[in-house]
Each structure stands twice: as structure tokens, then as C-alpha cells.
């Protein structure tokens, strides 16, 4: 694949099991902090790569705020971290975020063994121009989660460009202040089958204190996935269907919604949200139903899910 080829060209042999962190930063000392937390969590940095870009694709505001874009290749360093690789990836990223919370230019768009995020303050027609990697014939993907709009309720920033790590979001989360408060209140009582009690404390806070409503929803969805919650259950726990007004709903599905409603408050829009865990990809509209989402299956068996037919 392209990622392993880019390492091989530099004389680095990357094993089958590896992850790539995509990092925005203006201070390369941040990479040292990232490496330190990798080592704490039994992960090993094997290759650091500056992502090649073509700045002619950028407008002036994007160019003025352009971070350095770095890819860090990470592998498990012990048998235990190999068995808990995805958990250690998540824990490492959260600890880096906590440590560098005051560094407004530091952001990790993705750190995963399954997904990599190429995003920025770029017009959609220019993304392949800006990211030279995307033009390589060996760069293959099984799906793409793509978002054309920039943040509308917050100042456009590289780190706030969508998609986020697990979602792309059209609309607003109007319940976000209540959602954030409820997550903070309940987080101290949470138990996990994936993380130890001490690791859970190191993960907190679940939601980054800076960021948009989409950032908070992304943080919460990602937290559920990292703790072993099924992709579909996690999605519908946060963004439930209007089950109270669906008298013919399957009784088991209704029971699921009744149960989750006692434990978790809905993240209400109006919103249309696309989600992925690296294996599945899906799209939901919230129970208000005020943001469109349409799908088209083409003659060559491609599935497109968009907010508008003309997208």
C-alpha cells in the first residue's frame, strides 16, 4: 500500500500491524511529546514523514495559518500493546491532547490503524492538488468520508475543518451545552471493559474543552467505540430515531431506545451526520429530521450519500 511504500522508500520496513498519526503543528517539539507518550504506552515510533503539499491550492487565510503536516508511523512495542493496539493508540492521543492543550496549533486529525484523514482549509476541488499523496497511483481507499463545508458557527481553522476523526456533520447540535455538561458529570462514574481504572482517569476529560459542537459529538462517538461499543449501537445511542412516535417499530429496537434513553441524552440537531469506525460507514439524521441526506447507487455499484443531489 502507499503508506508502507512511503516508508520503504526511506529504508524503513513497516510491519503488517501499524498505525499512522496525522499531526498538525507549528512546533516540531510537539512530535517529541507525541513520541514520549507512545513510549509510555508501549508503542514505538518507526518513521516520521513530512507530508508533501502544494501551497498553490490554498487561499490567503489558509496559507497564513498553514501548519506543518506530519505523519508518524507507530507499531506495538510489546506483546501486550500488540493485543491492545487500538486502545493504546486512543489513550496515547488523548494524553497528548491533555498535555498540549494550550498549544492551539497542535492537532491530531487522525491516529488509527484503519483510517487516515487528509483535510484542511481547502476548496474541495483543490484537495488533490494540495495533498500530493492523493495523486499517487498506489494510494487506494475502500471508502471516503468527505465534507465540503467549513465551520459556520466558529472561526474557520485547520483543526476545525471537517471531517473529524469519526464523523462529518452538516447542521448544528443545539443540545450541545447540555450534552457537554452531562458527559462531564457522568464521566467520573464510568466503567470500562477495555481500559483499567487508572487508564480511564488518564483519558479524561472525554470531550476536548476547545472545539465546535461537531468536535464534541466526534469525541463522544469515538469514546464509545474505543470502549468496545458496537458501531451501530454507539451511533443510535447518541442520535436516536424518533422512536416514541413510531408505533410499528420492532419491539427489540424500541427496548434498545428505551434503555439507552435512561443512560444517555440524545445529541439533537437539526443534524445529518456521517460516521465511520474504519470498517463501517453510515449516515444518520437526527430525530428532528430537518437536515437532508440522500443516497444514490450508481450503475458501477458505487454508493454515494450526500446532503444534496448536486454535491
PLM region descriptions:
Residues 1-311:
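Conserved short alpha-helical segments that host acidic/polar catalytic motifs at enzyme active sites
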Amino acid at each position: 500500500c502507499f503508506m508502507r511504500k512511503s516508508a520503504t522508500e526511506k529504508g524503513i520496513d513497516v510491519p503488517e500491524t501499524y498505525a499512522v498519526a496525522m499531526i498538525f503543528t507549528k512546533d516540531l517539539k510537539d512530535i517529541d511529546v507525541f513520541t514520549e507518550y507512545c513510549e509510555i504506552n508501549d508503542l514505538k515510533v518507526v518513521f516520521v514523514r513530512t507530508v508533501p503539499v502544494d501551497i498553490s491550492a490554498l487561499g490567503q487565510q489558509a496559507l497564513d495559518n498553514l501548519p506543518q503536516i506530519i505523519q508518524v508511523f507507530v507499531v506495538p512495542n510489546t506483546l501486550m500493546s500488540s493485543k491492545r493496539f487500538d486502545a493504546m493508540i486512543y489513550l496515547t492521543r488523548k494524553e497528548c491532547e491533555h498535555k498540549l492543550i494550550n498549544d492551539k496549533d497542535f492537532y491530531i486529525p487522525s491516529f488509527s490503524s484503519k483510517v487516515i484523514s487528509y483535510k484542511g482549509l481547502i476548496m474541495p476541488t483543490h484537495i488533490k492538488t494540495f495533498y500530493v499523496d492523493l495523486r499517487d497511483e498506489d494510494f487506494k481507499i475502500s471508502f471516503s468520508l468527505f465534507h465540503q463545508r467549513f465551520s459556520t458557527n466558529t472561526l474557520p481553522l485547520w483543526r476545525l475543518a471537517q471531517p473529524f476523526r469519526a464523523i462529518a456533520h452538516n447542521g448544528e447540535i443545539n443540545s450541545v451545552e447540555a450534552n457537554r455538561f452531562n458527559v462531564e458529570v457522568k464521566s467520573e462514574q464510568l466503567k470500562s471493559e477495555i481500559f483499567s481504572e487508572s487508564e480511564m482517569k488518564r483519558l479524561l476529560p472525554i470531550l476536548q474543552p476547545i472545539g465546535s459542537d461537531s468536535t464534541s459529538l466526534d469525541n463522544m462517538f469515538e469514546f464509545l467505540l474505543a470502549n468496545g461499543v458496537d458501531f451501530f449501537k454507539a451511533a443510535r445511542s447518541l442520535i436516536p430515531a424518533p422512536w416514541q412516535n413510531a408505533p410499528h417499530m420492532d419491539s427489540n429496537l424500541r427496548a434498545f431506545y428505551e434503555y439507552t434513553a435512561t443512560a444517555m441524552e440524545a445529541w439533537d440537531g437539526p443534524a445529518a451526520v456521517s460516521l465511520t469506525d474504519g470498517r463501517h460507514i453510515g449516515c444518520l439524521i437526527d430525530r428532528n429530521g430537518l437536515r437532508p441526506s440522500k443516497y444514490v447507487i450508481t450503475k458501477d455499484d458505487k454508493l454515494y450519500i450526500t446532503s444534496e443531489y448536486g454535491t
